[in-house]
């Protein structure tokens, strides 16, 4: 068991028609570095990090923590999904008074964009989450300027709760669940 309470981690790999969501492995390291060094991927996430810094900082097996999925296509990592990071109470955007909601995050390599992989992978992760922690809301926060992410949020069924300024940009905050937001 982990800090997820009754949820054992890692789960068995989650398989869709073409994708596998799994725990990270050593063979994923180069793709992790590419994700964090990519100006395209990091446009709305604080910008790219220097590749030489990443080569030094990224561990041999990156991303090994509860709630972190590698998205693989034909065995190769094309992206990541985080699902069990709990939203900090000091940050804006919550659907529960006590905060601590699970927050969906995702990054995909540019060559995987426009193929529907993000929608399929996120939907599979959300289905897993709903089975593992029934009734728990999932939140998502993205810059309103990020058209691809806004489209994905709508496609996944997230409902807008509010918009606010954070990190120097307007943020869209939504929830995926039957939970009614407070406020």
Model-predicted segments: where are they?
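Conserved G/P- and acidic residue-centered "switch" motifs that form tight phosphate/ATP-binding loops
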Residues: 75, 116, 146
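Conserved active-site alpha-helix within GNAT-family acetyltransferase domains
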Residues: 119, 145-160
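Generic domain-boundary/flexible-linker signal
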Residues: 92-94, 115, 149
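A short helix-loop-beta submotif of the ANL/AMP-binding
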Residues: 112-119
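GNAT-family acyltransferases
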Residues: 1-111, 124-128, 132, 137, ...
């Amino acid at each position: 068991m982990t800090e997820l309470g009754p949820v054992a981690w890692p789960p068995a790999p989650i398989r869709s028609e073409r994708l596998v969501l799994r725990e990270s492995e050593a063979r994923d390291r180069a793709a992790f570095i590419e994700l964090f060094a990519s100006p395209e991927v990091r446009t709305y996430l604080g910008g790219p990090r220097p590749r030489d810094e990443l080569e030094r900082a990224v561990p041999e097996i990156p991303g090994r923590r509860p709630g972190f999925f590698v998205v693989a296509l034909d065995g190769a990592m094309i992206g990541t999904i985080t699902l069990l990071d709990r939203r900090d109470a000091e940050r804006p955007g919550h659907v529960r008074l006590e905060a601590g909601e699970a927050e969906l995050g995702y990054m995909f390599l540019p060559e995987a964009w426009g193929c529907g992989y993000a929608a399929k992978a996120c939907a599979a992760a959300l289905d897993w989450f709903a089975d593992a922690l029934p009734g728990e809301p999932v939140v998502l926060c993205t810059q309103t300027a990020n058209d691809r992410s806004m489209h994905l949020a709508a496609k996944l069924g997230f409902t807008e709760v509010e918009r606010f300024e954070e990190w120097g940009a307007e943020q869209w905050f939504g929830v995926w669940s039957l939970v009614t937001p407070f406020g």
